[in-house]
Amino acid sequence: MHRYRTHTCGALRDSNIGETVRLSGWCHRIRDHGGVLFVDLRDHYGITQCVVDPDSKAFGLAEKLRSEWVVRMEGKVRHRPEGTENPELPTGQVELYVADIEVLGPAAELPLPVFGEQDYPEDIRLKYRFLDLRRDRLHQNIMTRGAIIDSMRRRMKEQGFFEFQTPILTASSPEGARDFLVPSRIHPGKFYALPQAPQQYKQLLMMSGFDRYFQIAPCFRDEDPRADRLPGEFYQLDVEMSFVEQEDVFAAMEPVITGVFEDFAKGKPVTKGWPRIPFAEALRKYGTDKPDLRNPLEMQDVSEHFRGSGFKVFARMLEDPKNQVWAIPAPGGGSRAFCDRMNSWAQGEGQPGLGYIMWREGGEGAGPLANNIGPERTAAIRSQLGTKEGDAAFFVAGDPDKFWKFAGLARTKVGEELNLIDKDRFALAWIVDFPMYEYNEDDKKVDFSHNPFSMPQGGLEALTTKDPLTIKAFQYDIACNGYEIASGGIRNHKPEAMVKAFEIAGYGEQEVVDRFGGMYRAFQYGAPPHGGMAAGVDRIVMLLCGTTNLREISLFPMNQQAMDLLMGAPSEATTKQLRELHIKPNLPNK
């Protein structure tokens, strides 16, 4: 018989009744029923009920057992007494009648319980992550994560992609965030960088003649904490293809992502034939470039109905041609209480308020806006929006470039408050035609709006003849349920176009050569047209596990202050380590 176990704690069935077996695992729950001890023994595979009665020679030791002690138990498998079966457990028809116990690893008093799923302070959970990972929900999430990555790999290989690993120690490059720098001992004063993404390497692979590449790539960004991103590192399904246009990337990747979602959606519908939504349309209709299409609400421009109207606040705004008025329909939201609640919410978001119109019986408009613009204009708004009796609409006015984010938040808030969002499906879409450039208000200059290596629509001619802020790029995202889960583009593979694109963003040719020398050099020796994308593994897993917290699908994450409470990172380096690296700390004054 095996030293520790003949079966796992999830393996025993009726067919094992009468067998003498050994199990090893953790004491999940211990109960004393009239002097008989019941121990739920747990391992990775499941739970088996073990029974120790006072006549057993193991009873004295069993009385000393506590939660999360690791033990080996030996005994006979028997059927549970009639009426005590547990249909929720695969082992729920049987129990182990224990004859012998060996303690393999006692446990100290627990800082957080493993049995049950009660909430606990996050810092405690992260400090004792090894205990937290024993809890069923988190344990299953991590197993689901592994299965999702397996599904990604299988589907990518079915599409003809090859998996390669790119370097982790590389050169620093401006890709939108700070790099994590690694000092070189061999080259004093010089630094490697951990890759923010394998962007240059995957493009170099295409120039090296490899046709289709992918990897599950670790990425590192030294960013300030954000609610929707783990500090430090994340993983992405990284993809690149040669001799492709945008539609070729879509045709290759849409079935991969759809298939992964269908594998793990637990029966929830997944969008087939994803819509293609231009970036500008997404902002206008949904107030975001990652719309939640489960929310049926679409915003509309209703400026004409307020131009020259009796509502002077909007009328005066519309004298400036760049200003607009957008309407957010609210089906079934035509109560004063709801409209006042939305108005208070808007004020809490730092806005002066949220104008509204309610439609009463007979289609008559009500509220301050309706009173100011009159019944004819109110009826025209109702006709445009398709609102009915008992509905409402909310209005946001000003420069759309400044209010679209708030309008999008208001659309989401209305959808949530009125229970319009279908929580039981995954709504996927391509967002296309991103602007190549944007105006950076902080630096007072034109900058890249997305990926600097993307091909501008119109190529070099567009870069030399058009206003940069009007140029669109062959860039695209995948949106799902209000999250951006992937981003990509067709690459700028011509050196003269690459130099011009960076020049517009304020980089001289020599700086481009210095920063991207390897790729710039490769462009001189025959670069194929190529493109690709990167899908966020963590966010996809988060969505499919039904959580909104990325720490619930990650093994050993940092906290929001970018600290690893389990391992004690970051930590101070020793004087010897610093001396070897020729580094002297220059700490800020406290």
Curated annotation (Swiss-Prot):
Protein family according to the UniProt entry: Belongs to the class-II aminoacyl-tRNA synthetase family. Type 1 subfamily.
Protein's name in the database: Aspartate--tRNA(Asp/Asn) ligase
Domain of life of the source: Bacteria
Catalytic activity: tRNA(Asx) + L-aspartate + ATP = L-aspartyl-tRNA(Asx) + AMP + diphosphate
Origin organism lineage: Bacteria, Pseudomonadati, Pseudomonadota, Alphaproteobacteria, Hyphomicrobiales
Residues engaged in binding L-aspartate: 175, 221, 450, 491
Protein's organism: Bradyrhizobium sp. (strain ORS 278)
Keyword Ligase on entry: yes
Record-level Gene Ontology MF annotations: aspartate-tRNA ligase activity; aspartate-tRNA(Asn) ligase activity; ATP binding; nucleic acid binding
